[in-house]
From Swiss-Prot:
Keywords: Amino-acid biosynthesis, Cytoplasm, Lyase, Methionine biosynthesis, Pyridoxal phosphate. This is Cystathionine beta-lyase MetC. PANTHER family: CYSTATHIONINE BETA-LYASE-RELATED. The keyword Cytoplasm applies.
Length: 395
C-alpha cells in the first residue's frame, strides 16, 4: 500500500484477512492464555513469538498485531510497540537503549513529563541529561558528548510550538556520534504528517491517545522504529510488562480509518483561527507551525504535509488570577482539560513564569499570558465567536 495516497493507506492499513477473519474491521481477541493443539504447535509459537505468532497475551493477540502492522505501514517502520499511554512510550523507549554512564540530549521544549523522567528517574540510574534549544539546527554538535546515547526531539515543541530543522540535526548527530539513537515525540503530526523515519530518525513515538484514538476515550502510546532498533525496543518493552488491552488496540485501529478527514478539518479550522488571532489587537503572538512568522515555520513548510489542531497564542497582557478565571470559566464551546487530539475544542492557560520553569537552560521571550488551544471539529465560525466573547472579558 506504500504506493497509495494517505487516505487510502489509513483505511486499509492492518486490515489483512488474517486479522479481520472476513469482517471489515479487525477482530477483538481478548486473551491471556492461548491454547496450543500440539507440542509442535507450542514449539512453533515459541520460536516465532516475536513475529506476530499467537503465544501469550502479553505478546499480543490478533487485535494488537493488526494495529502494529498498520502503524508500520503508515510510518514506514520495521516494528511497532504498544504502550499504555504516551508517557510510557517515551520512558520505555529511552530505557531500552541507555545504561549507566550514558548521556541523553533532549530538546528543552519537550513535554514536561518527558523532561521530568530524565531529570528525576534517569539521574538515579547514573544517566545524565542536557538540553538544547529547539531551533539549534546543526549547532547541536556543540552539545554532543562521546557518551551521548540518545538525542530526543519533539517537533513542534510542547506549548510554544517551535519546529526543528530535523535534517540538519540528524546530519550533525550522525557526523559526531553515528551510533546514537535519535527519537522524536511525533504526536502533533499523528505520525503521518511528518514521516520521521524517512528523515533518518530511529524511533517515532506518539501518544496515540490523541489523534489516533481521536475521541478522548482511550489511552495508548506507540513507538515505531527502524530495523536497527526493533529487537531491542521490542524485548525491553516485553520485559518491562508494557502492553495494552485488546479493546484499546481495537479502538485505536478504528480511529485510524477517519484520521485523514479529521486531520484535514483540524488543519483548516486551526489555521483559520490562528490567522484571526494574529490580527487581534489583544494578541502579541500566535504560535502555529503553519502560520508564516511562527518559529520554524520554514521547516514545517519543507518537511510536513499538514497541520493538526494544537497551537498557542500569547496575550499582550498578563492576566491576574481573577481575570484569568473570568476568562477561562465562561467559554461555551472551549473546555478546560489536559490532553488534546479529540473531536472537541480545548483551552488551557500558562503564565510566562511557568513556561520559564519548565524550560531547562532556556529562555522565554514573552511576558503575557500564553493560551493553548486545541481546535476541534466544531464549526470554526462558532469557535471564533466564542473566542471573541472571551476577549471581551479581558479589560
Amino acid at each position: 500500500m506504500a504506493d497509495k495516497k494517505l487516505d487510502t493507506q489509513l483505511v486499509n492499513a492492518g486490515r489483512s484477512k488474517k486479522y479481520t477473519l472476513g469482517a471489515v474491521n479487525s477482530v477483538i481477541q481478548r486473551a491471556s492464555s492461548l491454547v496450543f493443539d500440539s507440542v509442535e504447535a507450542k514449539k512453533h509459537a515459541t520460536r516465532n513469538r516475536a513475529n506476530g505468532e499467537l503465544f501469550y497475551g502479553r505478546r499480543g493477540t490478533l487485535t494488537h498485531f493488526s494495529l502494529q502492522q498498520a502503524m508500520c505501514e503508515l510510518e514506514g517502520g520495521a516494528g511497532c510497540v504498544l504502550f499504555p499511554c504516551g508517557a510510557a512510550a517515551v520512558a520505555n523507549s529511552i530505557l531500552a537503549f541507555i545504561e549507566q554512564g550514558d548521556h541523553v540530549l533532549m530538546t528543552n521544549t519537550a513535554y514536561e513529563p518527558s523532561q521530568d523522567f530524565c531529570s528525576k528517574i534517569l539521574s538515579k540510574l547514573g544517566v545524565t541529561t542536557s538540553w538544547f534549544d529547539p531551533l539549534i539546527g546543526a549547532d547541536i554538535v556543540k552539545h554532543l558528548q562521546p557518551n551521548t546515547k540518545i538525542v530526543f526531539l519533539e517537533s513542534p515543541g510542547s506549548i510554544t510550538m517551535e519546529v526543528h530543522d530535523v535534517p540538519a540535526i540528524v546530519a550533525a548527530v550522525r557526523s559526531v556520534v553515528p551510533d546514537a539513537i535519535i527519537m522524536i515525540d511525533n504526536t502533533w503530526a499523528a505520525g503521518v504528517l511528518f514521516k520521521a523515519l524517512d528523515f533518518g530518525i530511529d524511533v517515532s513515538i506518539q501518544a496515540a491517545t490523541k489523534y489516533l484514538v481521536g475521541h478522548s476515550d482511550a489511552m495508548i502510546g506507540t513507538a515505531v522504529c527502524n530495523a536497527r532498533c526493533w529487537e531491542q525496543l521490542r524485548e525491553n518493552a516485553y520485559l518491562m510488562g508494557q502492553m495494552v488491552d485488546a479493546d484499546t488496540a481495537y479502538i485505536t485501529s478504528r480511529g485510524l480509518r477517519t484520521l485523514g478527514v479529521r486531520l484535514r478539518q483540524h488543519h483548516e479550522s486551526s489555521l483559520k483561527v490562528a490567522e484571526w488571532l494574529a490580527e487581534h489587537p489583544q494578541v502579541a503572538r500566535v504560535n502555529h507551525p503553519a502560520l508564516p512568522g511562527s518559529k520554524g515555520h520554514e521547516f514545517w513548510k519543507r518537511d510536513f504535509t499538514g497541520s493538526s489542531g494544537l497551537f498557542s497564542f500569547v496575550l499582550k497582557k498578563k492576566l491576574n488570577n481573577e481575570e484569568l478565571a473570568n476568562y477561562l470559566d465562561n467559554f461555551s464551546l472551549f473546555s478546560m482539560a489536559y490532553s488534546w487530539g479529540g473531536y472537541e475544542s480545548l483551552i488551557l492557560a500558562n503564565q510566562p513564569e511557568h513556561i520559564a520553569a519548565i524550560r531547562p537552560q532556556g529562555e522565554i521571550d514573552f511576558s503575557g499570558t500564553l493560551i493553548r488551544l486545541h481546535i476541534g471539529l466544531e464549526d470554526v465560525d462558532d469557535l471564533i465567536a466564542d473566542l471573541d466573547a472571551g476577549f471581551a472579558r479581558i479589560v
